Amino acid sequence: MPSGLQIACVLKRENPKDILICNTEKNLKTLKKGARVGTSSVRRIAQVLNVRPDLKIKSLRGNIGTRIKNLYSGKYDAILLALAGVKRLGIIPRNSNTLPISTILPAAGQGVIAVVCRKNDVQMQRILRNINHLDTEKCVVAERSFLAALGGSCQSPIAALARFNSKRSFLFDGLVSVSYTHLRAHETEADLVCRLLLE
């Protein structure tokens, strides 16, 4: 983030999972051997190949509409996208399947809209705090701390998802896809979870 700016608030998180949209099939298991799957995310590539090493990964660029159009034109057999982006655009793609986090863990902050303002604009910060979603903020802080401690970025094969369950326990899953090391913690405080995971 540029110096002088900061995240002032975050809105309530949309579903953070990934979605697989297929041309003719309906899910990851039924894709034909060697099917062409479109994604340019190293995180998604590592995880999908862990489940289906036979798949052929092809680079996928452009906005969501362009990506789906290229799928249905036959350039791909399936594509991987963030479910939140598809939902926010009101798109209901055919032959789609929301992937469980046990199959593909999302990127840190996936599904979250953050509002940024100047660090010296105290008045704006106070205004924006009124629309801040505290649970989402705690989760995002944990995920971003995990990513930062590993020296990761949006181009790193690192996944992280924090959330509260129905009993208000704080849950955290982290994944380093290079070594496929899966870290999990069940704690009550976001900062404690991060410390435990990074020890």
What is each residue range found by the language model?
Residues 50-184:
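Small-molecule-sensing regulatory modules
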Residues 1-54:
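A conserved helix-loop-strand patch within extracytoplasmic ligand-binding domains
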Residues 1-2, 86, 194:
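N-terminal segment of the mature folded domain
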Residues 42-43, 84, 187:
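Alpha-helix/helix-capping structural signal
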